[in-house]
């Protein structure tokens, strides 16, 4: 039996959707690690979301750490989690542990643009804010 197939994405069966996500290769897991951009960045670059990277400044939108901000210090594609500085909890023995967040629960406030490919993608995707034409019925 196959362990993963790209065709399972189109299935409506929850078991196949789970199998698709759990057994996906890393290049597919990267597509799951996208986060929304802030309204300012969205307007500037003409994109709604982008893959999250180490060094991006993010704001937590959901959960017990809601409205906290920090920089992404680690991205774990296998588990689909990100780790943000300042978003940590204290264990019973007193040590601090960084809390794992899902990329869908954060919003990117500032982008890390040291990567030339990422910068080129953002610059190339700038869309002019022209009004959409209404279709005739």
Where are these regions (language model features)?
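Residue-level "contact hotspot" at macromolecular interaction interfaces
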Residues: 51, 63-66, 100
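Intrinsically disordered, Lys/Arg-rich N-terminal extensions and targeting peptides
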Residues: 1-52, 125-137
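Structured, basic alpha/beta domains of bacterial-type, RNA-associated proteins
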Residues: 69-125
């Amino acid at each position: 039996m196959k362990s993963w197939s790209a065709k399972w994405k189109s299935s409506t069966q929850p078991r196949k959707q789970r199998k698709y996500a759990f057994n996906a290769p890393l290049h597919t897991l990267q597509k799951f690690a996208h986060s929304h951009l802030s309204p300012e960045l969205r307007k500037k670059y003409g994109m709604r979301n982008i893959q999250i990277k180490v060094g991006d400044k993010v704001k937590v939108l959901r959960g017990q750490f809601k409205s906290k901000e920090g920089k992404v210090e680690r991205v774990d594609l296998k588990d689909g989690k990100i780790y943000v500085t300042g978003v940590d909890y204290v264990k019973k023995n007193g040590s601090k542990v960084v809390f794992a967040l899902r990329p869908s629960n954060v919003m990117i406030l500032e982008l890390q643009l040291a990567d030339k490919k990422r910068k080129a993608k953002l610059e190339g995707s700038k869309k002019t804010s022209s009004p959409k034409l209404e279709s005739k019925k």
